[in-house]
Amino acid sequence: MVSSFRVQQAAREIRAGAVIAYPTEAVWGLGCDPWNEDAVYRLLALKSRPVDKGLILIADNIRQFDFLFEDFPEDWIERMGSTWPGPNTWLVPHQDLLPEWVTGKHDTVALRVTDHPQVRELCALVGPLISTSCNPGGRPAAKTRLRVEQYFHGQLDLVLGGALGGRKNPSVIRNLATGEVVRPG
């Protein structure tokens, strides 16, 4: 486990506009502040990912997403809450409360409450984060720090060390309104 000092350092870097790599439940992730347009576009450029695809937001608890839930039916909130923290990502209506560089061309945004202790600590310090697999477009997601360095040598502001969470597959993605599984886990 990485020290709290390193997590606090990562939080400071993110607040200053950094793009970082960090271990998640199954693979290494790239992340940044979702409200920092320059950081998000830099992350997208590193991945060669089009902005219109949208990105996932992660948090350490469901309350960090409260600003999105004001008009949601209570059963939607209960449905999400019953699966978090954990490997469940929900597509929820964003109601134009998030910038287009996060949502892409979609009227929904992908949300997950992580169960990786280090990432939860980081989100507790900075709020929700962009989280996407650590890989250039078309390449497999990094499963080791060495692969992170090989993919993005010198291009990241910080690589937060630590262990993966032990999951073999990425999170399942479901549409909150319909229950449809968009991506199996």
UniProtKB/Swiss-Prot annotation:
One function term, GO molecular function aspect: L-threonylcarbamoyladenylate synthase
Any one GO biological process: regulation of translational fidelity
Record's GO cellular component terms: cytoplasm
Domain YrdC-like: 4-185
Subcellular location: Cytoplasm
Keyword terms: ATP-binding, Cytoplasm, Nucleotide-binding, Nucleotidyltransferase, Transferase, tRNA processing
E.C. number: 2.7.7.87
Record keyword Transferase present: yes
Predominant location: cytoplasm
InterPro entries hit by this protein: DHBP_synth_RibB-like_a/b_dom, Sua5-like_dom, TC-AMP_synthase, TC-AMP_synthase_SUA5
Job of this protein: Required for the formation of a threonylcarbamoyl group on adenosine at position 37 (t(6)A37) in tRNAs that read codons beginning with adenine. Catalyzes the conversion of L-threonine, HCO(3)(-)/CO(2) and ATP to give threonylcarbamoyl-AMP (TC-AMP) as the acyladenylate intermediate, with the release of diphosphate.
Annotated family: Belongs to the SUA5 family. TsaC subfamily.
Protein name: Threonylcarbamoyl-AMP synthase
Gene this chain is encoded by: tsaC
